């Protein structure tokens, strides 16, 4: 099968087979709402046409798409349908080109919509002419196509453990980013050559099953079993979890340092924002939803619910606390202003209480409507448990001293409310209603 359109149709059905129309309506509605908010942001910030030519705009588009595609494709290779795809008479090049279109619609568009709205907004208010608008839309579209194809290529080399090719293409991409900053005239030709390399040379050989288990996975399976080690094993072997956590920690550090330099917020507010950003990192919070395929086995085994919960909580809270501590140390060292003791305790309370709430919410209302991990990571339901954490951050408005007492009390009330809800991961008395 060499026709890209039937393959694309199959891939979309794989993602949206159960609730295709509802998902399409949900995506369209989400894009409209996002567009309205971004237009309001552009107006509020007074962004003009000078921003279009800034280097950081192109770099942000390239890096954002590459990151999201890398995350999606590495997760995709863990799904059973990929093994079947490797056996079917499907053109590898056609498959990955079709997958690139699917990734743009399902993953990249809502995260890079700003780059397409900005020229249209400037055209609407008369700042850009029609020709200029088409130029910038074409330019952003070109870099979007390049970054998606590059992300597919890089992630496949990573999954298949072709380290030399991975480093080679990463070096080419780094040169593309440098050329965007220092030699803009060669950026587009260089991207075009790199895209041709991906489509002509690499894509035809990518539809092959990768190696199965890493050395770390083998070691963890041989060691004495524990749920705590099992969570670490899943985290280390899951590129989606690992990369999302690292990127969120790096973004939190960069964001806090920039806000501290500009003086927009004081130090305490910045560290609270860091806590909120780390806590919103959803892949490591869905520790019950991810157990969908092993749920019945875990229910039938003689396992105490509390034992499993505390193993997951130790892992989750440890990751959050470790990430915050690392960011706080780096930001404090660079800025020369270390975090105060009260602010540190306040942020630890937020993270530990938030982790407890998110994990409890996921246990009581797990999301089982996904067919592939890619659907779980990209779905809007992953933020549902985060909403229960918002009262904790509202408590910080009362001041540090008061919030230190209010945060644990608020967390206990929220957890008590969640525990009183019907259903849950271990409830077999009812059908799996959630997400189905």
Swiss-Prot record:
Q: Tell me what topology the record assigns in the membrane.
A: Multi-pass membrane protein
Main function: Involved in the production of the bacteriocin subtilosin. Required for immunity to subtilosin.
- The membrane-spanning stretches of this chain are 27-47, 51-71, 112-132, 134-154, 166-186, 187-207, 240-260, 270-290, 315-335, 395-415
Superkingdom is Bacteria
Q: Which GO terms describe its cellular component?
A: plasma membrane
Report whether Cell membrane shows up as a keyword of the record: yes
Q: What protein is this chain from?
A: Antilisterial bacteriocin subtilosin biosynthesis protein AlbD
Supply one GO BP term: bacteriocin immunity
Q: Where in the cell is it found?
A: Cell membrane
Q: Which UniProt keywords apply?
A: Antibiotic biosynthesis, Bacteriocin biosynthesis, Bacteriocin immunity, Cell membrane, Membrane, Transmembrane, Transmembrane helix
**Does this UniProt record's set of keywords contain Cell membrane?**
yes
Gene that specifies this protein = albD
- Name the source organism: Bacillus subtilis
């Amino acid at each position: 099968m060499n026709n890209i359109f039937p393959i694309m149709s199959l891939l979309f059905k794989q993602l949206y087979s159960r609730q295709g129309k509802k998902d399409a309506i949900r995506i369209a509605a989400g894009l409209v709402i996002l567009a309205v908010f971004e237009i309001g942001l552009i107006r509020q910030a007074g962004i003009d046409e000078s921003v279009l030519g800034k280097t950081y705009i192109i770099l942000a588009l390239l890096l954002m798409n590459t990151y999201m595609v890398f995350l999606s494709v590495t997760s995709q290779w863990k799904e059973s349908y990929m093994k079947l795809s490797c056996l079917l008479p499907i053109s590898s090049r056609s498959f990955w080109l079709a997958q690139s279109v699917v990734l743009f619609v399902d993953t990249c568009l809502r995260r890079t919509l700003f780059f397409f709205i900005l020229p249209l907004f400037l055209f609407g208010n008369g700042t850009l002419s029609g020709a200029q608008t088409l130029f910038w839309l074409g330019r952003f579209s070109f870099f979007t196509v390049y970054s998606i194809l590059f992300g597919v290529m890089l992630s496949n080399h990573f999954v298949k453990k072709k380290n030399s090719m991975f480093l080679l293409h990463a070096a080419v991409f780094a040169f593309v980013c440098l050329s965007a900053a220092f030699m803009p005239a060669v950026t587009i030709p260089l991207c075009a050559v790199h895209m041709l390399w991906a489509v002509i040379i690499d894509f035809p050989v990518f539809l092959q099953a990768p190696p199965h288990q890493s050395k770390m996975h083998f070691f963890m399976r041989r060691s004495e079993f524990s749920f705590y080690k099992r969570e670490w094993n899943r985290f280390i072997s899951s590129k989606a979890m690992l990369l999302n956590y690292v990127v969120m920690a790096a973004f939190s550090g960069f964001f806090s340092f920039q806000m501290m330099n500009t003086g927009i917020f004081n130090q305490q507010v910045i560290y609270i924002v860091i806590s909120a950003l780390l806590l919103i990192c959803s892949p490591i919070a869905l520790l019950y939803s991810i157990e969908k395929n092993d749920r019945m086995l875990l229910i039938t085994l003689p396992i105490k619910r509390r034992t499993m919960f505390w193993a997951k909580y130790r892992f989750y809270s440890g990751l959050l606390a470790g990430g915050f501590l690392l960011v706080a140390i780096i930001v404090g060292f660079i800025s020369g202003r270390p975090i105060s003791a009260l602010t540190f305790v306040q942020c630890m309370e937020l993270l530990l209480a938030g982790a407890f709430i998110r994990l409890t919410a996921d246990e009581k209302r797990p999301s089982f409507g996904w067919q592939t991990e890619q659907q779980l990571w990209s779905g809007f339901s992953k933020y549902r448990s985060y909403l229960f954490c918002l009262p904790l951050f509202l408590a910080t408005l009362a001041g540090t001293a008061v919030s230190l007492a209010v945060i644990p009390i608020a967390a206990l009330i929220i957890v008590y409310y969640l525990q009183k809800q019907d259903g849950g991961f271990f409830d077999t008395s009812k059908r799996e209603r959630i997400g189905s």
